[in-house]
Amino acid sequence: DEWRYWQADLLMERGRDDEARSILLALMQQRGFYPMVAAQRLGEPYPLRVEKAPGTISSTLTGGAEMARVRELMYWNQDNTARSEWANLVSSRSQTEQAQLARYAFDQNWWDLSVQATIAGKLWDNLQERFPLAYKDLFTRYTSGKDVPQSYAMAIARQESAWNPKVKSPVGASGLMQIMPGTATHTVKMFNLPGYSNPVQ
């Protein structure tokens, strides 16, 4: 997508507007950043496709032993083990069932599992389950009165952690925003934030 956009840009620069327009029109039919920019450049509305999870989730999916294990593990905050069970459950299902599982996880506020199901099922147009507005109250509270838009902070968290609050990178970054312990300590001191005592928080 990127090279096609820049090819059209170069053609426009050289006065070959018809060729450039043809490339941009074709490009804007795709999903992604450059297709959106192509539509914007042409002054056309971007045809955003949003899929909805199909119907009610099957009781065989929610009532099975695999889902019972996931629910139990999530209840006892054994999130990493639950994620492993979830990955096995999702990978063994059809795309329709994966969409239903993504929706089920979304409805349970298991946002990271919802995201995981959309990725496993390549459900790129299931935007609500793929990009849930997770932890919205938390982000509202901590971005209020700051020069950081809430949507930007949430986008960073989604990108960094896929909404898994317990994820830890190989280099030690952790949490929704994937903050390094040293950065957390420095930020607390710089802004005199109360209630922080160690990197485990």
Model-predicted regions and their roles:
Residues 60, 73-76:
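Loop-to-helix junctions at membrane interfaces in multi-pass transport proteins
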Residues 1-3, 7-10, 14-26, 31, ...:
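Catalytic glycan-binding domains that act on GlcNAc-containing polysaccharides
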Residues 43-52:
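Short, solvent-exposed, mixed-charge loop/turn linkers that connect secondary-structure elements
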Residues 52-64, 126-130:
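TPR-adjacent "capping" and linker segments in tetratricopeptide-repeat scaffold/adaptor proteins
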Residues 45, 62-63, 112:
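Acidic, proline-/serine-/threonine-rich low-complexity intrinsically disordered segments
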